[in-house]
Each structure stands twice: as C-alpha cells, then as structure tokens.
Amino acid sequence: MAVPPTYADLGKSARDVFTKGYGFGLIKLDLKTKSENGLEFTSSGSANTETTKVNGSLETKYRWTEYGLTFTEKWNTDNTLGTEITVEDQLARGLKLTFDSSFSPNTGKKNAKIKTGYKREHINLGCDVDFDIAGPSIRGALVLGYEGWLAGYQMNFETSKSRVTQSNFAVGYKTDEFQLHTNVNDGTEFGGSIYQKVNKKLETAVNLAWTAGNSNTRFGIAAKYQVDPDACFSAKVNNSSLIGLGYTQTLKPGIKLTLSALLDGKNVNAGGHKLGLGLEFQA
C-alpha cells in the first residue's frame, strides 16, 4: 500500500459523494486565478437565502517550489486575517511543518497553531499544537495501513485541564473501487460508511451513525452519476426523508454551474424546500 491518508481523510470518498455538488439555501460565487509567477488568488462569496447574510473570503497563495515553501494569506468578511507558512520535504522526506496564525482586529483575538505531519509507506502521523490563552491544546493522530487495511487513532489533550478531552478510533479497508470506514468517537458516537465505484460513471455511498443511549439511528444513501465529461448528477436521501438533488454543468472551460435542491419527502407539497445556485470561475 502507498502512504495511508490522514485521520481526517479516512472515509473521505464516501463523504464527498454526500457533500460535493450541493449548496442548499445558498447563492455562491467562486473565483480562482493564477498569475504567471505562480501566485494563486481564490475569492469566494455566498448569500444565505433564508437569513440574507452575506459571507466572503479572499486567499492568496504562493509556492516557492525550490525550497518546498508555501505562503498563504487569508481574509474573510468577519474581518479575520490569517497567515500560513508551510515547509514540506525539506528537513526530512515526508515531513511537513506549518505555522498558522490568525488575528481579528475587531475583537483583538489572536490564535496560533503549529502543525506537523509525517508520512511514508504504511504510516501517517500528525501532531498539532493550538496555543490558546487558557493553555495550549495538543491534537495527535496516527494512521497505519497494510494491504488495504487501515487503522487510526486521534486524541486531543488540553493542558489547562491536564486530561485527554477527545479520543477517537477508526478502522477501515480501502481499494480503488471500494472503501469501508468505521469509527468510534469518545466511546459514545459510532459511525460507518461504505463507498463503491460501480463503474467509470457511477459512484455510490452509504452512511450510518448513532449515539450510545439514543435509539435514533441516522442513515443515508447517495449516488453521483457522470452524465458526460461536462455534466454530473447527484442524489441523496436519509431516514428523515430529506432528499437532496444536485446537477453540475461545465458551461465552458473554466466556468462551472451547480444547481441543487433539498426536498422534504414527508411534506412535498408544503413548501419550505431549499434551493441552491453556485458559479465557479477558474482562469
């Protein structure tokens, strides 16, 4: 097996089938450009059709490939400024170091994180330190992989409380066409997902989750069908009879349109359904 994914990316293929291609209740516009010197600009804006709240963000990224460095600057409409510096494969092959900081001029709130990651065949390690006024917190994760089998552990230790505040386990199996993922969070949250690539055009996923002491099980199925190279259709439904539909069309190279709708299957004629519209420009 190649390098296993990070803990956060375990079960990602199934999650993508459930989440990508939808934007319920939002009108969204994304713009991505790249200059000749390698400077990348990404801007995003969205308006919530229910609350009419408008959010926006701007990100600039520059990669200094020769030294394995990436510089990122971020800003959003909450007036939060962020800076991220990443160095990869320089101190050691497979080692990635990131310094992430943010500052809100309105509130004076500051935040800083140091993220480390190390990956090689059969293993993926991660350790993040979040510097907070109350005291630093340490998040560590480990994923092991062998012949398609994956096992991972994630924990969060808060120095202010001197104890582990989060402890998560995951086990799974992965091939190019099939993925199985199960997880237990803090011994109370249980979940599982199955991803199946039926053929070149059709992808399906099943998701299951429940909480200890609660008989309510959450269940959902989803599918994505690539109609042609420029269009795809997505659909999903859960045990609450919420039906999600999405359609993505590439209008021309660099311009993509996404339409989505969330329907209440129990009250189809009652209204209250959510619609979404997204436009993405890339140059």
Swiss-Prot record:
Sites bearing N6-acetyllysine, chain numbering: 20, 109, 252, 266
Domain of life: Eukaryota
The keyword Transferase is assigned to this record: no
Activity regulation description: Inhibited by nitric oxide. Voltage-gated ion channel activity is inhibited by lanthanum(3+) and ruthenium red. Mitochondrial calcium transport is inhibited by lanthanum(3+), ruthenium red and Ru360.
Tissue-level expression: Widely expressed. High levels in heart and kidney with lower levels in brain and ascitic tumor. Very low levels in liver.
Modified residues annotated as N-acetylalanine in this record: 2
Phosphothreonine PTM positions: 19, 107
Cross-link (Glycyl lysine isopeptide (Lys-Gly) (interchain with G-Cter in ubiquitin)): 12, 20, 53, 61, 109-110, 161, 266, 274
InterPro entries reported for this sequence: Porin_dom_sf, Porin_Euk, Porin_Euk/Tom40
Modified residues annotated as N6-succinyllysine in this record: 20
Residues modified to Phosphotyrosine: 67
Residues binding ATP: 12, 20
Gene Ontology terms for molecular function: ATP binding; calcium channel activity; ceramide binding; cholesterol binding; identical protein binding; monoatomic anion channel activity; oxysterol binding; phosphatidylcholine binding
Subunit structure, as described in the record: Homodimer and homotrimer; in response to cyclic AMP or calcium; oligomerization is required for scramblase activity. Component of the mitochondrial permeability transition pore complex (mPTPC), at least composed of SPG7, VDAC1 and PPIF. Interacts with SPG7, NIPSNAP2 and SLC25A30. Interacts with hexokinases including HK1. The HK1-VDAC1 complex interacts with ATF2. Interacts with BCL2L1. Interacts with BAK1. Interacts with RTL10/BOP (via BH3 domain). Interacts with amyloid-beta and APP; induces VDAC1 dephosphorylation. Interacts with TMEM41B. Interacts with BCAP31.
Similarity comment: family membership: Belongs to the eukaryotic mitochondrial porin family.
Protein name: Non-selective voltage-gated ion channel VDAC1
Taxonomic lineage: Eukaryota, Metazoa, Chordata, Craniata, Vertebrata
